[in-house]
């Protein structure tokens, strides 16, 4: 009887941990959608533009969407383009933070590119009953 009880408790714990992991993966997609809406409202981006998000870590998983590209843009010499570097999420107690570094990619020559950072967006999520809820965002610039 005790073995069955322990088995059921461990099974519930595993299911809860799996749901929590899946919930964290959805947070990246949620933060990307919120960033896209903020950029549209501020007129930094048009609806026909591509949002270039470079993943800073291989463990980050995001859905493929038409408006988002995870590759560096193709530029001519002298051109520049805004890109956003997505960092891994950080946990601070009952809060989670997702950082997007705002960068400018500059094509200086055929083989030389330069990335200049100009600030970041930070999205905050709170934990309530083992689920994450969007709290607020902050925009930092240089």
Identify the role of each PLM range:
Residues 1-28:
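Bacterial Sec-dependent N-terminal signal peptides
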Residues 6, 14, 73, 122-125:
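Compositionally biased, low-structure terminal segments
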Residues 10, 100, 126-127:
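Hydrophobic side chains in beta-strands
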Residues 16-18, 37, 124:
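Extracellular/secretory pathway and lumenal proteins
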Residues 19-20, 140-142:
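N-terminal soluble segments of membrane proteins
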Residues 21-118:
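Surface-exposed acidic loop/strand-edge motifs in secreted or periplasmic proteins
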Residues 120-141:
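Short beta-strand edge/turn micro-motifs at domain boundaries
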């Amino acid at each position: 009887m005790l073995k069955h009880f322990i088995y059921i408790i461990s099974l519930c714990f595993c299911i809860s941990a799996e749901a929590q992991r899946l919930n964290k993966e959805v947070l990246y997609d949620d933060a990307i959608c919120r960033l896209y809406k903020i950029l549209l409202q501020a007129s930094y981006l048009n609806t026909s533009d591509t949002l270039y998000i470079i993943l800073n870590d291989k463990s980050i998983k995001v859905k493929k969407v038409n408006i988002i590209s995870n590759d560096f843009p193709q530029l001519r010499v002298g051109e520049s383009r805004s890109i956003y570097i997505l960092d891994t999420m950080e946990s601070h107690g009952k809060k989670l933070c997702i950082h997007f570094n705002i960068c400018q990619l500059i094509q200086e020559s055929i083989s030389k590119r330069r990335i200049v950072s100009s600030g970041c967006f930070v999205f905050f999520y709170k934990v309530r009953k083992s689920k994450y809820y969007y709290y607020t965002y902050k925009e930092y610039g240089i």
